[in-house]
C-alpha cells in the first residue's frame, strides 16, 4: 500500500492512486511499518510523505465507509486505534517529516499532512476536514488541529467542513510553503534536504521540546529548556559543529 524511496531524505508514497490513496486500515499499517523501518535506518535523516497520482489522500476508504455502521463497537474501536497510532506516530516521529500535498487532502488525509512537521502544498490543491458533512467527527484530527491553528480557526474548519485553497491554508498555519503546480514533491524534498543538513541530535531535541512545551506552565517550560540546553552541550554533534565553525568548513554530522 506504500512505496518507499530510501536515501538521505526518504520519500514514502501512499500508493493507491485509483482510489485516491484512502487511509484504509491496510494503508495505516503499511505506513506504520515504513516509518518504523526508516527510523531504524541511520542513513535516513528526514522523511517526505506524499501521494501517488492526483491526490495526496482522500481520507476514508469508500469500501470501508459502506459497511462502517454495520461493524460492532469492538471492530470500530480497533480501526480508530490504528488511525490514532498512525497520527501519533507521525506527529511524534523522531526524525523530521515533510508532507508534499500534491493534490486533494481530505478528512484523515488532511490530518495526516498536518501531523507532519512541515507541509508543502501544491497551489492548485485543496484540503479540508469534511467529516461532519457525512456524519463523522474529526476526532483524532482535532487533537493536533487546535494546537496548530487555535480554537477559533479549528472550530471554523471542523464545524463547516469546508475545503480551503493553498493560500488560505498557509495563512491559517496549516501549511508552510506553497509550490507551483506539479512541484510539491520537488519542493518538499528540497525543504527536507535543507533540514537534514542540520545536527540530528539538535533536530530531535527541538522536536521533543516543541511537543512538550504547549502542555507546560511558563516556569516548567523554562526549566525543561534549560535542561535541554545543558544536555546538548555534551553531545558529539555540538562538538563537531563548533569544530567545523572554527575550521571554516561544513560540519560532518
From Swiss-Prot:
EC number of this enzyme: 4.2.1.17
Catalysed transformations (reactions): a (3S)-3-hydroxyacyl-CoA = a (2E)-enoyl-CoA + H2O
UniProt entry keywords in alphabetical sequence: Fatty acid metabolism, Lipid metabolism, Lyase
PROSITE patterns: ENOYL_COA_HYDRATASE
Family matches, as SUPFAM superfamilies: ClpP/crotonase (SSF52096)
Top-rank lineage group of the source organism: Bacteria
Any Gene Ontology biological process: fatty acid metabolic process
Pfam families assigned: ECH_1
UniProt-listed InterPro entries: ClpP/crotonase-like_dom_sf, Enoyl-CoA_hyd/isom_CS, Enoyl-CoA_hydra/iso, Enoyl-CoA_hydra_C, Enoyl-CoA_Hydratase/Isomerase
Catalytic residues (UniProt): 131
CDD domains xrefs: crotonase-like
Any one GO molecular function term: lyase activity
Quaternary structure note: Homohexamer; dimer of trimers.
Family indicated by similarity: Belongs to the enoyl-CoA hydratase/isomerase family.
Protein name per its UniProtKB record: Putative enoyl-CoA hydratase
Provenance organism: Thermus thermophilus (strain ATCC 27634 / DSM 579 / HB8)
